[in-house]
C-alpha cells in the first residue's frame, strides 16, 4: 500500500519489490532493454518493472541506477578519513568537508573521532590527498584528523538482503576472490566521455541506454560495448541499483573495527569478509590514538541484529576481548552521493584552496 505525506511517496515494498531490489543490486544487464531482461528473470513484464521502480524511486528507497566504478582503477586517489571535533563545531565542520566534490560519504559516528568521511582526488590533483586533507583540517579547526587509506581490500559488495531470508551470521559458501582494482591503464579521452554518461541515473524507459548514447554522440551498442569493456578491465564493478539503506529497512549501520596482530591479518581479514552481513572489509593503517587495523561495515535491520552479526565475527576470529574491537554507529548522515568522475568541480575546489579563499560548503 502507498500513501503520500508531505509531498513524498511512502511505500512498503511487497515480496515482488524485494525480489526486484535484490536482482537490481546484483546488477542490471548491459543490454538495449535492461528492464525487460530483469523482468523476464522474475516473471514480470517490462511495464510492471518500470512501474515498481518508479514507486521505489519516488519513495527514495532506490537512490539511483548507475555504473558503480572503482575509484582507484580510474586513477583517483582516495581514503577514509577520521576527524575529531567538539560537538558544537561538528555540523559546521561537516558542511565544509562536504563541500569538496570528492567527498561522497560524510557521517557522524559514535566515537571520540566523531566525523568520518571518504575523500577522493583526481589523477592530476595539484594538492594530492594528504594536502587536501590538511586544508580541510585547517579550515574546519579539527582537533585531530587521520588519513586511513586502504592497505588491503578484502571485500566490497553492498547488496542488502531485501527478502529477509539471510541469517545474521550467514557466510559465503566459498571464499570470495579478492577484488581486482583495474588493469593499470589510465582511461582515454573516449573512455572518460563514456564514463561521464554511465555514471548518471538511468532513465526509467524501455531503451534507456539509447538516450545516453545520443548524448554521447555514439550509438547504443557502442556505449554498451564500452560498458562491458569497463567491467572486463575492472573500471566498473557492475551497473546496479544503489539503495537508501534506512528507507530500505536497514536502520543500523555499524562500522566494526578490530585490533588484529600483524601476523594474523591475512588469516582473519578474509574470514571476516566471508560474513554476508559484511559489505566492506579493509585493512587500514593504525596510529597511536587509533589502534584498529581491520574495518568491517555491517548493515542490519536493527542494532540488535548488527550486534549479533558482529558477535558472530568475534566468535569466528577469536577476538572476543571487548578491548580489541569497537563498533561505531552512524547517527547522522551529512552527505551521501555517488562520486562523480572527471568533472570540473575538483579543479574549482583546488583553485579556491590554493588561493586561500573560503572553501565551499555542502548545501550552500
Model-assigned labels for residue ranges:
Residues 1-364:
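A compositional/biophysical signature of low hydrophobicity enriched in polar/charged and small residues
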Amino acid at each position: 500500500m502507498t500513501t503520500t505525506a508531505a509531498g513524498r511517496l511512502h511505500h512498503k515494498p511487497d515480496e515482488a519489490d524485494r525480489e526486484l531490489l535484490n536482482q537490481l543490486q546484483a546488477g542490471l544487464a548491459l543490454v538495449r532493454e535492461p528492464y525487460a531482461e530483469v523482468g523476464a528473470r522474475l516473471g514480470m513484464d517490462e511495464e510492471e518493472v518500470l512501474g515498481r521502480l518508479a514507486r521505489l524511486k519516488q519513495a527514495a528507497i532506490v537512490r539511483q541506477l548507475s555504473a558503480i566504478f572503482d575509484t582507484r582503477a580510474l586513477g583517483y586517489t582516495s581514503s577514509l578519513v577520521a576527524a575529531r571535533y567538539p560537538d558544537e563545531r561538528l555540523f559546521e565542520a561537516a558542511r565544509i568537508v562536504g563541500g569538496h566534490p570528492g567527498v561522497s560519504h560524510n557521517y557522524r559516528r559514535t566515537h571520540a573521532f566523531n566525523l568520518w568521511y571518504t575523500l577522493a582526488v583526481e589523477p592530476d590533483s595539484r594538492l594530492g590527498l594528504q594536502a587536501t586533507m590538511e586544508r580541510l583540517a585547517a579550515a574546519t579547526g579539527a582537533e585531530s584528523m587521520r588519513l586511513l587509506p586502504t592497505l588491503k581490500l578484502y571485500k566490497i559488495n553492498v547488496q542488502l538482503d531485501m527478502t529477509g531470508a539471510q541469517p545474521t551470521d550467514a557466510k559465503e559458501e566459498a571464499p570470495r576472490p579478492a577484488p581486482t582494482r583495474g588493469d593499470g591503464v589510465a582511461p582515454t579521452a573516449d573512455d572518460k566521455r563514456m564514463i561521464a554518461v554511465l555514471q548518471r541515473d538511468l532513465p526509467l524507459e524501455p531503451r534507456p541506454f539509447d538516450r545516453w548514447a545520443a548524448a554521447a554522440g555514439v550509438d547504443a551498442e557502442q556505449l554498451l560495448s564500452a560498458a562491458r569493456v569497463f567491467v572486463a578491465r575492472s573500471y566498473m564493478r557492475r551497473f546496479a541499483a544503489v539503495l537508501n539503506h534506512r528507507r530500505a529497512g536497514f536502520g543500523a549501520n555499524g562500522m566494526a573495527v578490530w585490533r588484529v596482530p600483524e601476523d594474523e591479518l591475512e588469516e582473519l581479514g578474509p574470514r571476516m569478509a566471508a560474513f554476508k552481513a559484511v559489505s566492506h572489509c579493509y585493512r587500514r593503517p593504525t596510529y597511536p590514538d587509533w589502534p584498529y587495523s581491520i574495518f568491517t561495515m555491517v548493515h542490519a535491520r536493527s542494532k540488535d541484529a548488527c550486534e549479533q552479526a558482529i558477535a558472530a565475527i568475534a566468535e569466528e576470529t577469536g577476538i572476543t576481548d571487548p578491548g580489541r574491537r569497537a563498533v561505531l554507529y552512524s547517527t547522522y548522515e551529512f552527505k551521501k552521493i555517488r562520486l562523480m568522475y572527471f568533472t570540473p568541480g575538483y579543479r574549482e575546489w583546488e583553485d579556491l584552496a590554493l588561493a586561500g579563499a573560503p572553501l565551499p560548503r555542502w548545501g550552500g
